[in-house]
Amino acid sequence: MPGSAREMALLALSACEKQGAWSDGYLKKKIREAGLDRRDAALATRLCFGVLQNKLLLDFYLAQLSRLPLARLEEQVLECLRLGAYQILFLSRVPPSAAVNESVNLARKYAKNPRAAGMVNGILRNLLRQKDAMKTPEDLSIRYSHPQWLVKEFSDTLLDPQQLEALLAADNTQPPTVAQVNTCRAAAGEVLRALEEEGVAVERHPWLKDCLLLAETGSLERLSAFQAGWFYIQDAAARLAVLAAGAEPGMEVLDACAAPGGKSFAAAVAMGDRGRVVSCDIHPHKERLIRAGAERLGLHSITPMTQDGRAFRREWEAAFDLVIADVPCSGLGIIRKKPDIRYKDPAPLAGLPAVQGAILENVSHYVRPGGVLLYATCTLLERENGGVVSGFLEAHPEFSLEGFTLPGPAGDCPGGMVTLWPHLHQTDGFFFAKLRRSR
């Protein structure tokens, strides 16, 4: 069974649990190393993400069938059980015998305890027999596999219990792959036809112009339209932020926390590649990532740089028409894409508003009078969003919120701020505020 989809999922889950690895990046690396075809790569991804999306619920059921507390099991054995249980409970197309037998084989290969395979076999076969009689837990934390602290955070923000449950459920769905068309090189219809010819399931976004929804892509790098720089991957929420900012041809734009470069690309395309977009990140390897993306897209207006958003550059003072500050954040709006983020230690999150405020304070000096400062995050926590903006405005009367209108369900935003929700807008969870400098 070397290089199987289930084995790659197991290795990724174990790396997440033991090493703190991010599932998406680690799994892609293992899939490449194993040379999995498109179908097996999709299965490995579904298994890994499915287990992470439902880990607390899977453990709830497994704990009822195991003679030992789950905490006493070898990590690899527990992951084998979770993989098997996920397939039994959620993947109706997988034959139950395959779900059990492949999990047993993985336990036999990776567990230190020679009896582990037999235990995995027994627990999963018991689950097969009893699954229809098992009740769904009432606790939202267990039912939707969100730690209690996170359920409370979202509850404090949303207040409405029905909205809360809808958000938790949306976090466990698979987001579409969203492609933004590089209209400097191709038209949306041309890109759509090229992708269809390569076997990609593609449709136009229902409300966002020059945007396509992709499925069954396999590796994006293999697609000729990707290689030709006809599109880049970016969720609709991030593109909406750039639309609200109002990038226009000839502008001087600073993207202060730019990696992997999506908003810089969106601004450059909106500007017709005329003007300048200074695209910064604190890490040199991310500057290289932005540069590679800009070169693939043929966007010559983008100048990548390594720069800390908190470090002042005097030559940039009042030099930009538009400054975008998509600051480091808790990332709790992109749980659909990073399901393991919910299990990270929440303690470091307390210090984020101070970092965000420091970046916003610094880059605000780069906005020329009459220019725009766009503050953005991919989180849903008020203290990182409106809280940071309110604190900034109290200290900077020369800035004020400016309303905008967006396509789609968000519509008019007269207050100059908007939070996009996965369960309401079918986008990433995202916040942005548009601030205009008067003097």
Residue ranges of predicted features:
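S-adenosylmethionine
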Residues: M1-R439
